[in-house]
Curated annotation (Swiss-Prot):
<protein>
    <recommendedName>
        <fullName>Putative protein p49</fullName>
    </recommendedName>
</protein>
Amino acid sequence: MKLDNPHRYIGETIVLTNPSNNSQYLLNLEQQGYADEETKTLINMIRLLVEENKYLRKENNLLAKSHRGVGGLCRTQTRKRRAKSPLLYR
């Protein structure tokens, strides 16, 4: 779910799916004054999850870069790998 570039006419709208009865609901994330408390709470929770998702994606990218040794957090020099000793596999 990406809300970074919403459609200019739709705004921030997402589709909620209920798999138990194969139904889909459109939910507009813009706050409306006449929405009930349950809808407002749901919208706020989705907004928080979107922000957390963005943060976790950034963290995942940083960890992937450090794991691969491509810039990022990896500050150690890469060493040449030694050939594994055949004695280890006896």
